[in-house]
Amino acid sequence: MSNFAMSALCRVFTRGAPCGLSSCSSVTGLRDFCSGVSRLDRAGSDSMRTASPVNLTYDVFDGKGDSTPLVFLHGLFGSKSNFHSIAKSLVQRTGRKVLTIDARNHGKSPHSPVLTYDTMTSDLTHLLGQLHIGKCVLIGHSMGGKVAMTTALSQPNLVERLVVVDISPSLTSAHTNFHAYIQAMKEVKIPSDIPRSTARRLAEDQLRKIVKERSVRQFLLTNLEEQNGQYGWRINLESISNHLEDILGFPEFDTTYEGPTLFLGGSSSAYISSDDYPEIQRLFPCADIQYIPDASHWIHADKPLDFISSIITFLQP
């Protein structure tokens, strides 16, 4: 039985890097649910350990303009809905078509035992081909940022511009104890046939022991789903757990992406540090690095207006 388990910017200060590298300063087998929350079945799940692309679920927000579409890629534990309000605003303000996509093992996309940047890039390019999108602006947050970078470096002709949100092309240090989050989610126990509000409260109470920040608990709880009275995590916790080192890492590249690139970090986040600048310059020689004040890792949630303004400014010729 297959399983389904869960932004004005401050002034920019030049760092003296190529192409204006700069930064700003100040600144988510049903069995006995009483013995643990299972990961409910997802139709279309992969049963083979294969690099074959899966058919990703996505939402389209149509704009009236003919400019290159924007494609949003969410982070670990996230889903396409994380960017819905951002997408709607960008459609209104730019006229561009905007897509938000669920990665494999996330949201409503199929489950697979394989979760690497190669496979996630393959999924994305497969979808773009299906939709006859020959070029796009890729905007990826965290894990999605690494998928966006991998795509730009391996298939640059597909990417007109690149926005990488609060992540770098390197090993992600243990800023967050993802292993503990996954284990805490696996250990959540919820009885069947109870109201969703009650189930959510019970799950949050159990997560609170490990996940101290309420905002993070609320984010993880967006993955709690009910089917036929049974509650489970829609993300594939097993695959995420098995591939966490792959997700925290980044593939090696000798190629570069020469297109316009924006690395957008939160000033209160440690995911893009000065230690990462040399590798960013090497792989993305025309990159700008900017920070949004008072924003954490979840920039788009903390400072949505600043986040949107940053993207619109970056899109201007």
UniProtKB/Swiss-Prot annotation:
Transit peptide: first to last position: 1-20
Cellular component terms per the entry's GO annotation: mitochondrial matrix; mitochondrion; oxoglutarate dehydrogenase complex
Annotated GO MF terms: carboxylic ester hydrolase activity; lipase activity
Catalytic activity: 1-octadecanoyl-2-(5Z,8Z,11Z,14Z-eicosatetraenoyl)-sn-glycerol + H2O = 2-(5Z,8Z,11Z,14Z-eicosatetraenoyl)-glycerol + octadecanoate + H(+); a 1,2-diacyl-sn-glycerol + H2O = a 2-acylglycerol + a fatty acid + H(+); a 1,3-diacyl-sn-glycerol + H2O = a 1-acyl-sn-glycerol + a fatty acid + H(+); 1-octadecanoyl-2-(9Z-octadecenoyl)-sn-glycerol + H2O = 2-(9Z-octadecenoyl)-glycerol + octadecanoate + H(+)
Residues at the catalytic site: S142, E238, H297
Enzyme Commission code(s) on record: 3.1.1.116
One Pfam entry name: Abhydrolase_1
Source taxon at top rank: Eukaryota
Localization of this protein: Mitochondrion; Mitochondrion matrix
Keywords: Hydrolase, Mitochondrion, Transit peptide
Chief localization: mitochondrion
Post-translational modification: Phosphorylated.
Domain annotation AB hydrolase-1: ranges: 69-304
Biological process annotations from GO: lipid metabolic process
InterPro entries associated with the record: AB_hydrolase_1, AB_hydrolase_fold
Function: Catalyzes the hydrolysis of diacylglycerol in vitro and may function as a key regulator in lipid metabolism, namely by regulating the intracellular levels of diacylglycerol. 1,2-diacyl-sn-glycerols are the preferred substrate over 1,3-diacyl-sn-glycerols. The enzyme hydrolyzes stearate in preference to palmitate from the sn-1 position of 1,2-diacyl-sn-glycerols.
Family, as annotated: Belongs to the AB hydrolase superfamily.
PANTHER family: PROTEIN ABHD11
Name of protein: sn-1-specific diacylglycerol lipase ABHD11
Taxonomic classification: Eukaryota, Metazoa, Chordata, Craniata, Vertebrata
Gene that specifies this protein: abhd11
